[in-house]
Amino acid sequence: MKKIGLLTSGGDCPGLNACIRAVVRTANYYNIEVVAFKRGFKGLIENDFTTLDYKSVAGILQKGGTILLTAREPRFKDYNFRKIAYENIQKHNIEALFVIGGNGSFQGAYLLQKDFGLNIIGIPKTIDNDIYGTDYAIGFDTAVNNAMEAIDKIKDTTMSHERIFIVEVMGRDNGFIALEVGIAVGAELTLIPEYPFPLHVIEETILKAKEMGKNFAIIVLAEGVASAKELSEILNERLKDKDVGEIRYQVLGYIQRGGSPSAYDRVMASKFGVFAVEKFVQGEKNFMVAYENGKLLTKPLEISFNKVRIPNLEEYQINNILSM
């Protein structure tokens, strides 16, 4: 019987369990055994594994997080520890390692491919949706919905008390979540790192809203732009004589990464998992599953971390048109 390895690595996100389920059940369908390593690359180094089958993944489709657990493993940067990981993989007679991860995870997995010739198959996941080479990564849709639902509640209070609220969403290096959420909640202003706004433009936008008779405003801020706390303090000081009221802030944080995956994430995670295993069965090696122009395809793993994906300028323009 053929064997494949499976792990989840990096930050968790909704849809991981749906993908695990799809990989395992598709593998079992083709009479392939799945050896799953716990806590990502840490599990490879420590040979901490379990065998998954059709029954063991029952009832996990709708659950957030990952049943395999996940962790960041700095030791994996060291060749000697990667060699230990590879030797553990060899003990199980694994023909390919399936890695459900993001940019960093794929970069680590690629080192196993480069150092030892291991067949690596990547399945993209990250709420940031910033993996180059694919239009979609597992977890993004749920994260956007989580943020939208939270901001809708904040907006009720914002309108009732006639306030301005800066809401910080995840997106350390990119603004994909902020852009989608900004449109979904009708934000007066959306700030992302790719297209920075000068401080005076932010001030002018707030004052313009006031002139238009708006007594409330939602500003969606990607965390990579600035701290919501610091930005609110700066704006409160600079606008204290402008009669715009107190500017408050809220950091949404990890609420965006948790919870039951949306229908879209469940379906996409399932499709990604099935597609990855079927391509392995067909003999393809060393690839990343990608979703492009509505179709699933394979791409070289290294493309995911050699380039940077940035938001579509058209979507950014939509935000600007609809704001205010």
UniProtKB/Swiss-Prot annotation:
Regions that span the bilayer: none
Q: What is its EC number?
A: 2.7.1.11
Could you say which residues bind ADP here?
A: R21, A22, V23, V24, R25, K155, G186, A187, E188, K214, N215, F216
* Cofactors required: Mg(2+)
Which residues participate directly in catalysis?
Answer: D128
User: Which residues does substrate bind?
Assistant: T126, I127, D128, R163, M170, G171, R172, E223, R248, Y254, I255, Q256, R257
Q: Which reaction does it catalyse?
A: beta-D-fructose 6-phosphate + ATP = beta-D-fructose 1,6-bisphosphate + ADP + H(+)
Q: Which UniProt keywords apply?
A: Allosteric enzyme, ATP-binding, Cytoplasm, Glycolysis, Kinase, Magnesium, Metal-binding, Nucleotide-binding, Transferase
Question: Which GO CC terms are listed, alphabetically?
Answer: 6-phosphofructokinase complex
Location relative to the cell? Cytoplasm
Q: In which pathway does it act?
A: Carbohydrate degradation; glycolysis; D-glyceraldehyde 3-phosphate and glycerone phosphate from D-glucose: step 3/4
What is an example of a GO molecular function annotated in this UniProt entry? monosaccharide binding
Which residues of this UniProt protein bind ATP?
G11, R72, E73, G102, N103, G104, S105
Q: Which domain of life is it from?
A: Bacteria
Q: Where does Mg(2+) bind?
A: N103
Q: How is this chain's activity regulated?
A: Allosterically activated by ADP and other diphosphonucleosides, and allosterically inhibited by phosphoenolpyruvate.
Summarize subunit and interaction data from the UniProt record for this chain. Homotetramer.
Concerning its family, UniProt says: Belongs to the phosphofructokinase type A (PFKA) family. ATP-dependent PFK group I subfamily. Prokaryotic clade 'B1' sub-subfamily.
Among HAMAP family, the record links this protein to: Phosphofructokinase_I_B1
Q: What does this protein do?
A: Catalyzes the phosphorylation of D-fructose 6-phosphate to fructose 1,6-bisphosphate by ATP, the first committing step of glycolysis.
Q: Under which name does UniProt file this protein?
A: ATP-dependent 6-phosphofructokinase
Its taxonomic placement starts with:
Bacteria, Pseudomonadati, Aquificota, Aquificia, Aquificales
